[in-house]
A protein has these predicted regions:
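Membrane-helix interface segments
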Residues: 37, 69-78, 105-111, 151, ...
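Cytoplasmic-entry segments and transmembrane alpha-helices of multi-pass inner-membrane transporters
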Residues: 62-97, 141
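Transmembrane alpha-helices
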Residues: 1-4, 126-129, 137-138, 151-180
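Hydrophobic alpha-helical transmembrane segments in multi-pass membrane proteins
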Residues: 48-60, 90, 94, 124, ...
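Membrane-interfacial helix termini and adjacent extracytoplasmic/periplasmic loops
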Residues: 26, 91-120, 152, 185
Length: 186
């Protein structure tokens, strides 16, 4: 951690180099926040992370429910497909999406980056929600159906409230993962 503390201390250095501490100053931070291009990149990065995490959480939640309700032999196949993006290196995934988008003549920009971030965030959400689904008591679902609940009512009244902590955790994991793999757009 020494290099991190060193950088933090010298961020407040009035001098222009990191050889000698010449006095306390916030000028480097002032220069940082005066750079409008950097602020724009920061805003775009957080917006992209927010939006991609939201979409990935919606898709990943219903994907996890689908995997959970699938037959055992299909569950393994779906989980294997889901895990491909988790084990593949980020550079390979990025290059694959670039090839896909250019081959499909999809314009590169915010939407292509958003689609890529959603695609590599979905597996994280699925992996956060599936364990919670497996902990769920199947008798609650059966009881809801026995009492006349429709599939939508069971989902809304039983399953989603039970999954809420895992859904929130999945969202924040996807958000963090998206922030980690930020991209400059435009």
């Amino acid at each position: 951690y020494i290099p991190i503390f060193y950088l933090i201390a010298y961020a407040f250095n009035a001098g222009e180099d990191m050889n000698r501490f010449t006095g306390f100053s916030l000028s480097h931070f002032q220069n940082l926040f005066e750079d409008s291009r950097l602020i724009l990149i920061l805003v775009q990065t957080f917006f992209l992370a927010f939006l991609s995490s939201l979409i990935a959480t919606l898709i990943g939640t219903f994907g996890a429910i689908y995997i959970y309700q699938a037959r055992k032999k299909y569950q393994d196949a779906f989980l294997s497909i889901n895990n491909i993006l988790m084990v593949a290196p980020d550079v390979m995934i990025g290059a694959s999406f670039l090839i896909l988008f250019t081959t499909a003549k999809f314009q590169l920009g915010f939407l292509s980056v958003l689609a890529s971030h959603v695609a590599f965030s979905i597996p994280i959400v699925v992996l956060m929600i599936l364990p919670r689904l497996k902990e769920m008591n199947d008798d609650m679902i059966k009881a809801a159906y026995d009492l006349g609940a429709s599939q939508l009512q069971m989902l809304k009244e039983i399953m989603l409230p039970y999954l809420t902590p895992a859904i929130i955790a999945g969202y924040f994991m996807a958000f963090t993962y998206s922030l980690d793999d930020f991209a400059e757009i435009g």
